[in-house]
Amino acid sequence: MNVTLLIPARYGSSRFPGKPLAPINGKPMIQHVYERASLAKGLTNIYVATDDERIKSAVEGFGGKVVMTSPDAASGTDRINDAINQLGLKDDDLVINLQGDQPLIDPTSIEQVISLFERHPGEFEMATLGYEIVNKAELDDPMHVKMVFDNDYYALYFSRARIPFGRDTKDYPVYKHLGVYAYTRRFVQAFAALPLGRLEDLEKLEQLRALEYGHKIKVAISAFDSIEVDTPEDIRKCEQRLAVD
């Protein structure tokens, strides 16, 4: 099975302009993401998907591969779809979408989503990762997306709110979503063609579009957390983690 990992990277960000090139211990963040991903077993190729020449130059500077996408991409999925069309991937090729703000992603987490497709061929169209929240401050933080899933580990919903809500207790596990997706090229193209979902638009979470249109999302629970860099303050958290990693 051919497995291509794509890292979408956008220079513009309302909260943190130039985020992919922000230095973390002397390296741009996108380099940390790329190098972490390259340690995962089972990958055929890794590319950064971007529309920015500064990001392209930085990636090529450390020996990485880049696919240039349209600056008019309306969403991360549109950028991924543009990239896979340029790369000429086959319908059944597996695509891993690793968000470019995950400089501490554990390579085994990437291997987990690949393994789901290997062990359950044809049972679902999309897979992703969850992690049980241990930092209580994340429970009610809308920047940390929460998720619920059924007994067979199929996603039921994703929300910026705390879900599920315990009416009579606060002592129960809550899982957050980690920014890794896996799907076939065929599904990416079908997904990108779907109209914006009502819930997707409300929560600003693209994965809800898949659920709204009846597609299954298989979930693997990671043993490792991954810090998402949303603000300059998150850079310091990453550097502290890397100091003991």
From Swiss-Prot:
One GO MF annotation is: 3-deoxy-manno-octulosonate cytidylyltransferase activity
What are the entry keywords? Cytoplasm, Lipopolysaccharide biosynthesis, Nucleotidyltransferase, Transferase
- Provide GO CC annotations from the record: cytosol
Please give the pathway this protein is involved in.
Bacterial outer membrane biogenesis; lipopolysaccharide biosynthesis
What subcellular compartments does it reside in?
Answer: Cytoplasm
Under the heading InterPro entries, the entry gives:
Cytidylyl_trans, KdsB, Nucleotide-diphossugar_trans
Membrane-crossing residue ranges in chain numbering = none
Per UniProt, what is one Pfam family of this protein? CTP_transf_3
**What does the entry give for GO biological process?**
lipopolysaccharide biosynthetic process
Enzyme class comes to transferase
Main location, first listed in the record: cytoplasm
What EC number(s) has UniProt assigned to this enzyme? 2.7.7.90
**Catalysed transformations (reactions):** 8-amino-3,8-dideoxy-alpha-D-manno-octulosonate + CTP = CMP-8-amino-3,8-dideoxy-alpha-D-manno-oct-2-ulosonate + diphosphate
Q: Which CDD domains match?
A: CMP-KDO-Synthetase
The family note in this entry says: Belongs to the KdsB family.
Q: What is the role of this chain?
A: Activates KDO8N (a required 8-carbon sugar) for incorporation into bacterial lipopolysaccharide in the Shewanella genus.
What is the name of the protein in this document?
8-amino-3,8-dideoxy-manno-octulosonate cytidylyltransferase
Q: What is the protein's species of origin?
A: Shewanella oneidensis (strain ATCC 700550 / JCM 31522 / CIP 106686 / LMG 19005 / NCIMB 14063 / MR-1)
